[in-house]
Amino acid sequence: ESFIKKYIGIDVLEARLHELENEMDNDQNKIDEYCNIQNEYIRLDGYNIPYKLDKVLLGLGLNQEIKSKKIKELSGGQKEKVMLSAVLLKGTDLLILDEPTNNLDLKSIEWLEKYLKEIQCPIMIVSHDRKSLDDVVTKIIEIDYFTRNLIEYPGNYSEYKKFKQQQ
C-alpha cells in the first residue's frame, strides 16, 4: 500500500497534513498550507485510495496480504500486477498501457477490460491480445510505416482488420 501511495504522490501529502495538524494552532500560514495540501489530496482522491486499492488488487487476483509486503518480497507477476494497480489508480489525463493483459489470468483480464471501459479518461493500449482489443477499444490509430502519419479507424480491432482487408 505504501508503494502505491508513494507512486500516486499522496504519501508525502499525508505526512505533511499530519505534521500541520499538530502545528497549526492559529498560524494562518500553516492553516493556508493545510488547506492547499488537503485540496491536492482531495484532487488525487486520497481519501478513497484504500477502498479503490482493495478493489483493484482483488480484480487483478491479488489478496489483501500483499499490501503488507515489500516490493522486493513479491514475485515477478505480483510486481507487475502491483505496478498495473498503481498506474490504474494514479488518475491521469491519458492512460498508456503496454501489454496490460500479460501475466493476467482470464478472470483478471475480464475485470481489467470492464474497468477500462468504465474509467473516464482516454486510453492508449499497445497489445497483441486481439480479444481484449475487440472488447475494449473504440478506435484504432495506425502509424503508417512509410509516411509516419497517423491514420484513425473507428471501431475495434476486428473492424479495423476487415477495413484493411477491403483496401
Q: What do these predicted regions represent?
A:
Residues 1-167:
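ABC ATP-binding cassette signature C-motif
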